């Protein structure tokens, strides 16, 4: 209420000041009506506001009156009740009764006045106290003092949060530009720590909070005149706010109005399906970290730059013969039966002669067959024979329901026969609903023509099955849902002649009828393919990248509830295969399907996983230091002569040039970069044999890196029993020893009182030399931030800062692990080392020598000669003091 009146007063004063200005230019003609409308709207808002205030005051007055009357009635009733009693002050009466009861109790027990006498002069040395009482029962009590042993105070302990991995500092935790308060242990007072008054920033401008009336003003103005610069400038004259704040507020009001509009869930679902996958996954791209594989990553932050690698991870290829149907609507139930049925008697068939797109067919539905639910007596079967260009047949049998219309006595003649195609060039395929694939060819040629057979049969089968695909999901819920129909309704009207054993007869009239049927089938095919939304198509293409041409996995993982496996397979072999081709192939959707299928088969056979490559015969490669691909700057950094360089993935395509950020910073391109594997700046890992990754011969270890299972050849991790396709565990139980930080294989660390200073870290079990003990974790802060925090830590005689690289410093004061309590020593038993693990610099603590159990851990902080605390300074005359490097603050440095 007060804020609205204040805002209205400020807006009126602002408008008055603007009107009183001299030499002001005339307002444009388009601004005059906006100004007038807003002025009238402000008057209406003020009048409604005044009316609302009056009503609110009246309601509050009535409420206060009722409340006061009720309190007055309660007080009056209490006064009447007190007058009706014996009278007197109740409080004084109760006090007197209490004193009387206490005195009576003492007299009843015979206890008089007790006198306590302290015999300080006589019994001070012996440490005794004598208590005596006078009265009827005089008593004397001697109390002997017990001197307690001196117990040292517990060292100061700062509350901290455990971190299993490093994380960046929150924006509101920065101390730069703020006055820091610390407590002086000597004077026991709070002091302000600040270098100078110049560090104190200017007070920030208060953010404007919009009132309800201002929201109405902004909403009406934007709805009537739109949101442009002129409207915003006019609104600034009535609202004491900046143009950017007004624009942000208008967007908030627009979103709020959209939510309150009450759009149905069905419309929202349809709108989400019409969006592309990039639009739907906008929040996913901002929140998901592709380096840590977690949401809301605290190490790399949100809204990272998306880096799309040019080379995708290969997927495993599995032939259809080894697959199992994923459900009732799986395409393998139709495609998996490419064989000739020798044990089923055929009394009718449908023959399709294929040449230049012409089709001839013949149908008979009087064949009895087994149904999928083991009812051999029920259900009819429809079979068809597809005659190809090399003489083989395709027979597809589908059981129909018992209520199907009885077959007509007439069957159609073959509408179209190939007159100029010799019989020897015809090829026949046979498709059965079940059973392994079989070819009527010699075993030597079977594997050679596998691709073309699959593409040819799938193309024909999908065209025939298109009219029934739309209702497959509904039929699968019914008891007879697995009894699908493949043939078109036009096949019910075929003639009654059975020409299964006769020669085909062609007429011009039937050819025209059949061409219309084929054209209608093609039109329905195009309509079905167009039913795929933009989101479904994008999910399909993403499934091709992840799972390859496996419709079972695509439908199950990406299109669950939207498309069935049969629909995905049909889309794949008609339209999706051409869409999923890489841009380098540059094929159209209407291209040769067999060629498209052949290209994909070749890609599948070449792009195999690391599992398949390792099972094969390993090649003997010549190993050189250059194969590691790390620049010489890494070696200098490994010697501790300069800081490590922060790694940021590059977005280069194919090969990196001189303008690559990684090349400019002197870092290697990692697996997270967008460049290809053949990039000269790419780190290629190591090819070390057994037990060589912990020596200087390993390129990863020499460059202060940990081995990466995705990059290094022989440094891989196995887990499980191999049922999920992972590589089997090695018989000797060998595991790379340069992946301790990555796998978090740290030792057990205990926390206790240190004999040196404060708290200390102790090892629970004995360890050997160079064994990995644990990771030094904390907040990632900038060097400027570390300088400000270090001044406070120096006054508290503690140091939790650790130099990491040229951009970040680790601070374990508030967040970290137990190794933050490891003290400094000039003769340490541990050492710290910065390692590059999966593109991130991390600090590992390693044993410098053999350490027994329960022994305290020490490592050299590398203090400067003038910055080490008193307990951490070396004895006088030490030669190593001259070689130590002076730093700006007391901090820890890895070697």
Curated annotation (Swiss-Prot):
Residues 628-732 form the CXC domain. It is found in: Nucleus. Widely expressed. Its main location: nucleus. It comes from Zea mays (Maize). SMART domains: CXC, SET. This is Histone-lysine N-methyltransferase EZ3. GO terms for biological process: heterochromatin formation; methylation. Its EC number is 2.1.1.356. Residues 528-578 form the SANT domain. Polycomb group (PcG) protein. Catalytic subunit of some PcG multiprotein complex, which methylates 'Lys-27' of histone H3, leading to transcriptional repression of the affected target genes. PcG proteins are not required to initiate repression, but to maintain it during later stages of development. One of its GO terms (cellular component) is PcG protein complex. Keywords: Methyltransferase, Nucleus, Repressor, S-adenosyl-L-methionine, Transcription, Transcription regulation, Transferase. The keyword Nucleus applies.
């Amino acid at each position: 209420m007060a804020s609205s009146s204040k805002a209205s007063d400020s807006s009126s004063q602002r408008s008055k000041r603007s009107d009183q200005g001299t030499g002001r230019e005339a307002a444009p003609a388009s601004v005059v009506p906006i100004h007038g409308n807003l002025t009238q709207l402000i008057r209406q808002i003020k009048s409604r506001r005044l009316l609302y205030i009056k009503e609110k005051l009246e309601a509050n007055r009535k409420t206060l009156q009722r409340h006061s009357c009720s309190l007055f009635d309660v007080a009056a009733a209490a006064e009447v009740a007190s007058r009706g009693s014996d009278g007197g002050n109740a409080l004084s009466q109760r006090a007197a009764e209490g004193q009387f009861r206490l005195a009576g109790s003492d007299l009843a027990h015979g206890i008089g006045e007790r006198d306590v006498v302290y015999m300080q002069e006589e019994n001070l040395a012996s440490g005794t106290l004598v208590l005596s009482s006078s009265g009827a029962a005089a008593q004397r009590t001697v109390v002997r003092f017990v001197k307690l042993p001196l117990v040292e105070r517990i060292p100061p302990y700062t509350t901290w949060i455990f971190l299993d991995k490093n994380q960046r500092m929150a924006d509101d935790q920065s101390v730069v530009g703020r006055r820091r308060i610390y407590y002086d242990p000597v004077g026991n007072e709070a002091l302000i720590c600040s270098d100078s008054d110049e560090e104190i920033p200017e007070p920030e401008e208060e953010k404007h909070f919009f009132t309800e009336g201002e929201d109405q003003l902004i909403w009406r103005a934007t709805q009537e005149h739109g949101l442009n610069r002129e409207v915003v400038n006019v609104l600034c004259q009535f609202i004491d706010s900046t143009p950017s704040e007004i624009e942000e507020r208008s967007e908030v009001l627009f979103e709020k109005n959209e939510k309150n509009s009450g759009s149905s869930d069905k419309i929202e679902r349809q709108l989400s399906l019409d969006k592309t996958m990039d639009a739907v996954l906008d929040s996913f791209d901002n929140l998901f970290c592709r380096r840590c594989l977690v949401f809301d990553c605290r190490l790399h932050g949100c809204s990272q730059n998306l880096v799309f690698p040019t080379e995708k991870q290969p997927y495993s290829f599995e032939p259809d013969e080894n697959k199992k149907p994923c459900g009732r609507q799986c395409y393998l139930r139709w495609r998996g039966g490419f064989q000739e049925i020798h044990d089923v008697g055929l009394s009718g068939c449908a023959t399709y002669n294929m040449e230049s797109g012409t089709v001839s067919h013949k149908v008979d539905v009087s064949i009895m067959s087994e149904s999928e639910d083991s009812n051999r007596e029920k259900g009819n079967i429809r079979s068809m024979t597809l005659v190809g260009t090399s003489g083989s047949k395709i027979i597809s049998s589908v059981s129909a329901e018992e209520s199907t219309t009885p077959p007509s006595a007439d069957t159609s003649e073959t509408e179209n026969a190939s007159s100029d195609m010799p019989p020897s060039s015809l090829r026949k395929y046979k498709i059965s609903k079940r059973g392994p694939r079989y070819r009527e060819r010699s075993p030597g040629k079977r594997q050679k023509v596998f691709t073309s057979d699959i593409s040819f049969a799938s193309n024909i089968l999908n065209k025939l099955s298109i009219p029934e695909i739309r209702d497959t999901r509904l039929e699968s819920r019914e008891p007879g849902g697995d009894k699908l129909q493949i043939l078109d309704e036009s096949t019910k009207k075929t003639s009654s002649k059975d020409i299964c054993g006769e020669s085909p007869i062609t007429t011009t009239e039937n050819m025209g009828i059949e061409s219309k049927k084929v054209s209608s089938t093609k039109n329905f095919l195009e309509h079905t393919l167009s039913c795929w939304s933009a989101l479904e198509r994008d999910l399909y293409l993403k499934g091709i990248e992840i799972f390859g041409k496996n419709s079972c996995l695509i439908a199950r993982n990406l299109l669950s509830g939207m498309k069935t496996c049969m629909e995905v397979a049909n889309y794949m072999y008609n339209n999706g295969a051409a869409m999923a081709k890489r841009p380098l192939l540059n094929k159209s959707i209407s291209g040769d399907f067999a060629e498209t299928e052949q290209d994909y088969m070749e890609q599948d056979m070449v792009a195999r996983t690391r599992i398949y490559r390792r099972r094969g015969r390993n090649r003997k490669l010549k190993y050189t230091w250059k194969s590691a691909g790390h620049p010489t700057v890494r070696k200098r950094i490994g010697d501790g002569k300069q800081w490590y360089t922060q790694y940021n993935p590059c977005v280069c395509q194919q090969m990196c040039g001189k303008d690559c950020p990684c090349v400019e910073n002197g870092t290697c391109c990692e697996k997270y970069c967008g460049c290809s594997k053949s990039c000269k700046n790419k780190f290629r890992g190591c090819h070390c044999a057994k037990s060589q990754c912990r020596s200087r011969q390993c390129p990863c270890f020499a460059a202060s890196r940990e081995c990466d299972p995705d990059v290094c050849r022989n440094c891989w991790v196995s887990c499980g029993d191999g049922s999920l396709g992972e590589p089997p565990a090695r018989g000797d139980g060998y595991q790379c020893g340069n992946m301790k930080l990555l796998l978090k294989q740290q030792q057990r660390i205990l926390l206790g009182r240190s004999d040196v200073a404060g708290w200390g870290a102790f090892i629970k079990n004995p360890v050997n030399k160079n064994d990995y003990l644990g990771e030094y974790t904390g907040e990632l802060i900038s060097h400027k931030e570390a300088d400000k925090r270090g001044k406070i830590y120096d006054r508290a005689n503690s140091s939790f800062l650790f130099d990491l690289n040229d951009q970040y410093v680790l601070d374990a004061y508030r967040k970290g692990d137990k190794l933050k309590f490891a003290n400094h020593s000039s003769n340490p038993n541990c050492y710290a080392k910065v390692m590059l693990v999966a593109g991130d610099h991390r600090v590992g603590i390693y044993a410098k020598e053999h350490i027994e159990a329960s022994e305290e851990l020490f490592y050299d902080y590398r203090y400067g000669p003038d910055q080490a605390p008193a307990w951490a300074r070396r004895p006088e005359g030490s030669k190593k003091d001259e070689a130590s490097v002076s730093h700006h603050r007391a901090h820890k440095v890895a070697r």
